[in-house]
Amino acid sequence: MAMCASPRPFRRVGSAGAAALAAGGAGGAERRGRPAPLQDETLGVASVPSQWRSVQGIRGETKSCQTAGIATAESSAQARTHADAQVQTEAPEEPAAMAPVSQYDTLRLEAFLRRVEAMVIRELNNNWQSHAFDGYEVNWTEQQQTVSCLHTLVYPLAQGQGLHVTGISWNSTGSVLACAYGRLDDGDWSTLKSYVCTWNLDRQGLNPQQPSVVVEVPSAVMCLAFHPTQPSHIAGGLYSGEVLVWDMSRPEDPLLWRTGLTDDTHTDPVYQVLWLPEPRHSHRFQVLSAATDGKVLLWRGSGAGQLRLTKGFALAVQQLPRSTKLKKPPRGETEVGVTSVAFSSFDSSLFVLGTEGGFPLKCSLASEVAALTRMPSSVPLRAPVQFTFSPHGGPVYSVSCSPFHRNLFLSAGTDGHVHLYSMLQAQPLTSLQLSHKYLFAVRWSPVRPLVFAAASGEGDVQLFDLQKSSQKPTVSITQTQDGSPVYCLEFNSQQTQLLAAGDAKGMVKVWQLSTAFTEQGPREVEDLDQLEAEITT
């Protein structure tokens, strides 16, 4: 039987491989029934190239992105119009030739001057004493010839309760007017709620029936006064005897200081409050209060919201000068009620008091005489009275010291008279009957030495110019149409053409004065001195 071997593929091997194959072939017949031993072989290297990069190159896509386009715009600006101008100095002029100095005879000129000297001096003295041009002034501005009402201010809620305007005051800038609401007639005032209101007259769109600030007060307000330098601070005196200070720049919580109900507090209504500089610190101020309990007290604000008593005075009947013949007071009453105060413009310690008994009293803050009183006080009370003047026929509700003369002051009483006094004599220099009813206020003008104003119980404000007449008013202004009393008035020391007056109808009227009452004459102060001298002699 014949066998045919199938062909195997040809493979190149190395020499070692060939030798092994030859040896294996020789003994193959002998070992054909068992496997041959394993041997190492070294094979050729086969490389397979990567297809990934080429595939990614085919499949990949290139993308790009950016933010949205930024919109920009350009513009230019310049003045709407322009103008060009050229300037230069004027063409110089040739100076005129200096005239030759004339020749004169020195001896003859000297003789002439000696001869006329006495005559020229005599004429100059005559001109100095002449009154030919008194009152002549150049009018640079238009003259206001009438007195007109600029504003009629009223708080409807207070007016609806029948409250009176008991006090008014201008602030230190002259732009804000404050008024106190209370009562000055019969009635139970102890539980009467009242108000303090302010109006800024310089504010645009002024509403005369809507105050800028309203402060509600639990007791009737009898008087008030703005701080001399702090435009928003107001001191007020109440019917209950308390003294309060408000800061009107804090309308939500305006109360700054108060005396509280202590042994130092007044026991009767406070009729006047004033601000006084402290003796050693002129930029600091304290509050002075005067009441019908006979006490004049000085208060200083503390950090605890309290007014602390620093000094006090009491008016005891037995300590008044002997020239004062007061009616015998009721049993147990030894104090003289105070109704008004005015300080001298020339001596900060000198002041005048108006009293319920009708006597104006000259007083001093420097007094060290102990007051004979049993009223309780945390500080020693002094007796301030130095001199007593002849009385009115009733209580003196207002006194005013002249800002131009150290010795003159005015007083107004319920007898309807205004008295002009000198500090140097008891009798008044002159007495003017201005009303058949009470006079509640009198004030000197801050700019005219011979002008003053008075408020009457017949509803009039009367303006006097003593340069024109010393017996009758120059102008009488009707404040109330029904004759209701005018209780208070104040000149504006900053805007001197303004005069404010408050009345029993609950209204405050601001009057614009004519230039005749606001422009001082060239010799007015001298005329005031002469008036005092003529009346005194």
UniProtKB/Swiss-Prot annotation:
GO terms for molecular function: dynein light chain binding. The keyword Cytoplasm applies. Keywords: Cell projection, Cytoplasm, Cytoskeleton, Phosphoprotein, Repeat, WD repeat. Expressed in brain, thymus, heart, lung, liver, spleen, kidney, testis and intestine. Disruption phenotype: The majority of deficient mice die in midgestation from 10.5 dpc to 12.5 dpc. The mutant embryos exhibit open brain, spinal bifida, microphthalmia, and polydactyly. Inactivation of the protein results also in short and stumpy cilia with an abnormal accumulation of ciliary proteins and defects in Sonic hedgehog signaling. It holds the Pfam family WD40. WD repeats lie at residues 216-256, 265-309, 391-431, 434-474, 481-521. Residues 107-132 are annotated as: DYNLRB1 binding. Belongs to the dynein light intermediate chain family. This is Cytoplasmic dynein 2 intermediate chain 2. The lineage of its organism: Eukaryota, Metazoa, Chordata, Craniata, Vertebrata. The gene is Dync2i2.
